[in-house]
C-alpha cells in the first residue's frame, strides 16, 4: 500500500481545522496510520523544504511553517498520494475548486492550510523526517 504525508500548517491548526482535514482524508478511504502535533523548528523545516531552498520564497516559507504548531499525519491506501493531492486542491486557494481543502479552507498562497507529498518517492523521505517506522500503526480498517 502507498503511504503519504499530510501536514496541517499553522493557519489550519490555529483555526481548529486539523480534525476536519483528517476526517476528509479518511472519507477518501485512506487509513490514518500515524499522527502527531509538533512545533517545527528551522532545522526540520530546512530538511523538509530542501527542494525549495533556492526559491525566493524559501525564507518566508520557513518563517511561516515554524510560526506555530503543525499536525503531521501519515495515511495509507491505494493511490494515496494522488487521492490526497486531488482532495487538497491547487497550491493557491484562489485557484482551488470548492470542495477541496484549500478551496474551502485556505487563506492565501502562503497560508494554504496543508502540505501533502507530491510523489510516492518523496512521501517516503518526508515521512521519515517526522515519524520512525515504529510510530506507524498497522491495523485492519473496518
UniProtKB/Swiss-Prot annotation:
Organism: Dehalococcoides mccartyi (strain CBDB1)
Higher taxonomy: Bacteria, Bacillati, Chloroflexota, Dehalococcoidia, Dehalococcoidales
Functional note: Major role in the synthesis of nucleoside triphosphates other than ATP. The ATP gamma phosphate is transferred to the NDP beta phosphate via a ping-pong mechanism, using a phosphorylated active-site intermediate.
Keywords recorded for this protein, A-Z: ATP-binding, Cytoplasm, Kinase, Magnesium, Metal-binding, Nucleotide metabolism, Nucleotide-binding, Phosphoprotein, Transferase
Ligand binding (ATP): 9, 57, 85, 91, 102, 112
Catalytic activity field: a 2'-deoxyribonucleoside 5'-diphosphate + ATP = a 2'-deoxyribonucleoside 5'-triphosphate + ADP; a ribonucleoside 5'-diphosphate + ATP = a ribonucleoside 5'-triphosphate + ADP
Top EC class of this enzyme: transferase
Active site (UniProt): 115
Needed co-factor(s): Mg(2+)
InterPro entries, sorted: NDK-like_dom (IPR034907), NDK-like_dom_sf (IPR036850), Nucleoside_diP_kinase (IPR001564)
Name assigned to this protein: Nucleoside diphosphate kinase
Predominant location category: cytoplasm
A GO cellular component entry from the record: cytoplasm
Subcellular location: Cytoplasm
Family label: Belongs to the NDK family.
GO annotation (BP), single: CTP biosynthetic process
Annotated GO MF terms: ATP binding; metal ion binding; nucleoside diphosphate kinase activity
Subunit and interaction comment: Homotetramer.
Top-level taxon of origin: Bacteria
HAMAP family: NDP_kinase
Xref: Pfam families: NDK (PF00334)
Gene giving rise to this polypeptide: ndk
The protein's Enzyme Commission number: 2.7.4.6
Amino acid at each position: 500500500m502507498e503511504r503519504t504525508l499530510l501536514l496541517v500548517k499553522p493557519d489550519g491548526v490555529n483555526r481548529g481545522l486539523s480534525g476536519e482535514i483528517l476526517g476528509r482524508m479518511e472519507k477518501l478511504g485512506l487509513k490514518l496510520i500515524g499522527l502527531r502535533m509538533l512545533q517545527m523548528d528551522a532545522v526540520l523545516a530546512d530538511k523538509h523544504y530542501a527542494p525549495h531552498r533556492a526559491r525566493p520564497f524559501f525564507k518566508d516559507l520557513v518563517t511561516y511553517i515554524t510560526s506555530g504548531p503543525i499536525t503531521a499525519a501519515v495515511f495509507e491506501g491505494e493511490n494515496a498520494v494522488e487521492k490526497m493531492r486531488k482532495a487538497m486542491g491547487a497550491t493557491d486557494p484562489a485557484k482551488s475548486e470548492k470542495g477541496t481543502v484549500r478551496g474551502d479552507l485556505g487563506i492565501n498562497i502562503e497560508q494554504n492550510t496543508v502540505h501533502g507529498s507530491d510523489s510516492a518517492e518523496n512521501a517516503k523521505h518526508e515521512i521519515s523526517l517526522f515519524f520512525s517506522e515504529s510510530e506507524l500503526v498497522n491495523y485492519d480498517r473496518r
